[in-house]
Amino acid sequence: MLHLEDDNGRQRSVIANLQKFVYCCLYLRFIKDGSLFLILLGWIISSLCDFIQELTLRYLKKNYLEVGRDNDQEDDESLAIRGLETPIVRMIINKAIRYYQGLILLETAYCIVYHIRLDVSRDICSKPYGFVIMLLIREFTCPVPTAFPSKLLLVLLDILLLFCQIVIINGSLSSSLQNVKLIVKELNAEEEGALNILKLNTWHMDATGPELIVLKNHDKSIPQQADGDDATEITPLLNIAE
């Protein structure tokens, strides 16, 4: 059990470090292009990922890790964790994925248009903050040399940010806590890849939202389908409900 808890803590630590890295990249990009709208979009996306991770962790704790709790403690925390029933969580996750897709699309489209139209000499060189704060990241020089790819760093930051944001949202949707792990079946990130979340059609999905699978890690992983009020355990080898 110890190694499972270590793995769970390691996953959350990786996501937390990626979030910090994203904030650093957002700041560096703001130093380079001065776009408040882009940094605001990046912050909203990161906040949405934090919300999803907190939701999935609380869902696992409430529905699968509360066996053996005394009644007094359960009554004290009932208000804090109310509303985490499976149908409600499925609908929230469905809307969160939809909002995430829209925000990523808006961020990417705005990045392309803004950075194509960006004139370094006119829009950057006239602003002093890009040349006195960050002297170690090869800031733009003024006047801009003709042979210097002045927007190359912006392109790299855009790609890096998009990649990190996709990794973070997938990690947030596959949260694990102690001996249980939550998986969104429709994402199928292990086979389709992390980019599959961008192709997921949340509008044509079941009204109740994506199907949630809870893996209980004992000697072997036993998938537990959290599709209703009472989950059904399925033995992988026999593929029949017990």
UniProtKB/Swiss-Prot annotation:
Keywords: Membrane, Transmembrane, Transmembrane helix, Vacuole. It is a multi-pass membrane protein. It comes from the Eukaryota. Its main location: membrane. It is found in: Vacuole membrane. The keyword Membrane applies. The chain crosses the membrane at residues 128-148, 152-172. GO terms for cellular component: Dsc E3 ubiquitin ligase complex; endoplasmic reticulum; fungal-type vacuole; fungal-type vacuole membrane. Component of the vacuole-localized DSC E3 ubiquitin ligase complex involved in the targeting of the complex to the vacuole membrane via the AP3 pathway to ubiquinate vacuolar membrane proteins. Competes with GLD1 to determine the subcellular localizations of the DSC complex. Part of the vacuole-localized DSC E3 ligase complex composed of at least TUL1, DSC2, DSC3, UBX3, CDC48 and VLD1. This is Vacuole localized DSC protein 1. It comes from Saccharomyces cerevisiae (strain ATCC 204508 / S288c) (Baker's yeast). The gene is VLD1.
